[in-house]
UniProtKB/Swiss-Prot annotation:
Residues 72-87, 147-166, 214-257, 317-334, 398-399, 461-472 are extracellular. PANTHER family: AMINO ACID TRANSPORTER, SODIUM-COUPLED NEUTRAL AMINO ACID TRANSPORTER 5. This is Sodium-coupled neutral amino acid transporter 5. Keywords: Acetylation, Cell membrane, Disulfide bond, Glycoprotein, Membrane, Transmembrane, Transmembrane helix. It comes from Homo sapiens (Human). The chain crosses the membrane at residues 49-71, 88-108, 126-146, 167-187, 193-213, 258-278, 296-316, 335-355, 377-397, 400-420, 440-460. One of its GO terms (molecular function) is neutral amino acid, sodium:proton antiporter activity. Pfam families: Aa_trans (PF01490). Belongs to the amino acid/polyamine transporter 2 family. The keyword 4Fe-4S does not apply. Its main location: membrane. Glycans are attached at N226. Symporter that cotransports neutral amino acids and sodium ions, coupled to an H(+) antiporter activity. Releases L-glutamine and glycine from astroglial cells and may participate in the glutamate/GABA-L-glutamine cycle and the NMDA receptors activation. In addition, contributes significantly to L-glutamine uptake in retina, namely in ganglion and Mueller cells therefore, participates in the retinal glutamate-glutamine cycle. The transport activity is pH sensitive and Li(+) tolerant. Moreover functions in both direction and is associated with large uncoupled fluxes of protons. Predominantly expressed in stomach, brain, liver, lung and intestinal tract.
């Protein structure tokens, strides 16, 4: 369904004043009739405050990628990692600026509709496909967390070794959780109160951050011994290779696993499909105000990511894994609470992520069709089976972070916003050789290079077996 203002019809106003109004106010080009109330974007006046919009966008940014950031720091060094993280944050903010500019000109409030405005129906299909792939990757990362953490939690409560009993195998448990919990929730016709789980997810990740900081000061250097384990148990999954026995932090380092670090960071900052819906709901919407929302949200997540990665790395140094929770003692009470909170959050988030995938598939494959329960159920079943098979076959969550962070993440952050800007902003307003369009072009080229280099190094690691030899 087209989401454009009929008065604008996706066309640029003839007068420059109208264009400036759209850039700054996200408003129709013509002012309201005398004595009437000003009409906000899309004839809808948002009621969400600035602070709540920041919270909503922070929820959209926050995800499972935070669990892999300490691993990324271990393979880049503290200073190099923080510099790369800052660059990704700044580039994400710039790409949101491009999206808001395009949306203001075209009068569109959906990422997919920008694709249609730029390239017609084919553009909408491409954008929807990229978003679906990214959400499938997010679902896979959530289910992988269940696969790796749920056996430890159940084994702790039952005083059993999670590696010894068949009913504690992660592959079996994710199938059980998918059938008994996720599938019934995914079959709901509307999200309802499931939409509030994003707030729960952010709360759980804040709890995770506080716990990581606390455990750093409690453990000191956790290399070679485990001060939190009960009855002198070893750290769960602590690798014996590559330990930094001196507990010295590396400021700059480069190794074969660095090909995963930037994709993990890119994966952690993707929020772009949710920017325009949040913009629509914003009270007193303007481009400048929404950009401020984005900057505050990205800045807050940068601080949270930086703290989590730094304290996680300074606890385990070069031995840290891509799924950092696996580094802590299985029986530590605080970490057990963190595991339970994270498991609850990711389990309830999976059906929330599944809803937009199903909606996009129905719009692409069955446009104009009335609601059908058999189709509704079939799409949910196929998606869950596909994701479960993917999670069972993939050896580490790092591979999920790496592949999605190297494909859909640069597409959503770098490539698509720059292409939209080049196609949607008319040459009468910004000539192709103007500095803003040259910047956008370079931004898109950077995204293509980032994708090619990351995928190239990852495939090389897989081909040479260095990924398995790393012990992660």
């Amino acid at each position: 369904m087209e989401l454009q203002d009929p008065k604008m019809n996706g066309a640029l106003p003839s007068d420059a004043v109208g264009y400036r109004q759209e850039r700054e106010g996200f408003l129709p080009s013509r002012g309201p009739a005398p004595g009437s109330k000003p009409v906000q974007f899309m004839d809808f006046e948002g009621k969400t405050s600035f602070g709540m919009s920041v919270f909503n966008l922070s929820n959209a940014i926050m995800g499972s990628g935070i669990l892999g950031l300490a691993y990324a720091m271990a393979h880049t060094g503290v200073i190099f990692f923080l510099a790369l993280l800052l660059c990704i944050a700044l580039l994400s903010s710039y790409s949101i600026h491009l999206l808001l500019t395009c949306a203001g000109i075209a009068g569109i409030r959906a990422y997919e509709q920008l694709g249609q405005r730029a390239f017609g129906p084919a553009g909408k299909v491409v954008v929807a496909t990229v978003i679906c792939l990214h959400n499938v990757g997010a679902m896979s990362s959530y289910l992988f967390i269940i696969k790796s953490e749920l056996p430890l939690v159940i084994g702790t409560f039952l005083y059993m070794d999670p590696e010894g009993d068949w009913f504690l195998k992660g592959n079996l448990l994710i199938i059980i959780v998918s059938v008994l919990i996720i599938l019934p929730l995914a079959l709901m016709k509307h999200l309802g109160y499931l939409g509030y789980t994003s707030g729960l997810s952010l709360t759980c990740m804040l709890f995770f951050l506080v716990s990581v900081i606390y455990k750093k000061f409690q453990l000191g250097c956790a290399i070679g011994h485990n001060e939190t384990a009960m009855e002198s148990e070893a750290l769960v999954g602590l690798p014996s290779q590559g330990l930094n026995s001196s507990c010295e932090a590396q400021m700059f380092t480069v190794d074969s696993q660095m090909s995963y670090t930037v994709p993990i960071m890119a994966f952690a900052f993707v929020c772009h499909p949710e920017v325009l819906p949040i913009y629509t709901e914003l009270c007193r919407p303007s481009k400048r105000r929404m950009q401020a929302v984005a900057n505050v949200s990205i800045g807050a997540m940068f601080c949270m990511y930086g703290l989590t990665a730094t304290f996680g790395y300074l606890t385990f140094y070069s031995s840290v894994k891509a799924e950092m929770l696996h580094m802590y003692s299985q029986k530590d009470p605080l970490i057990l609470c963190v595991r339970l909170a994270v498991l609850l959050a990711v389990t309830l988030t999976v059906p929330v992520v599944l809803f937009p995938i199903r909606r996009a598939l129905q719009q692409l494959l069955f446009p104009g069709k009335a609601f059908s329960w058999p189709r509704h159920v079939a799409i949910a079943l196929i998606l869950l089976v596909l994701v479960n098979v993917l999670v069972i076959c993939v050896p580490t969550i790092r591979d999920i972070f790496g592949v999605i962070g190297s494909t859909s993440a640069p597409s959503l952050i770098f490539i698509l916003p720059s292409i939209f800007y080049l196609r949607i902003v008319p040459s009468e307003v910004e000539p192709f050789l103007s500095w803003p369009k040259i910047q956008a072009l370079c931004f898109g080229v950077l995204g293509v290079l980032f994708m090619a280099v990351s995928l190239g190094f990852m495939f090389a690691n897989w081909a040479t077996g260095q990924s398995r030899m790393s012990g992660h």
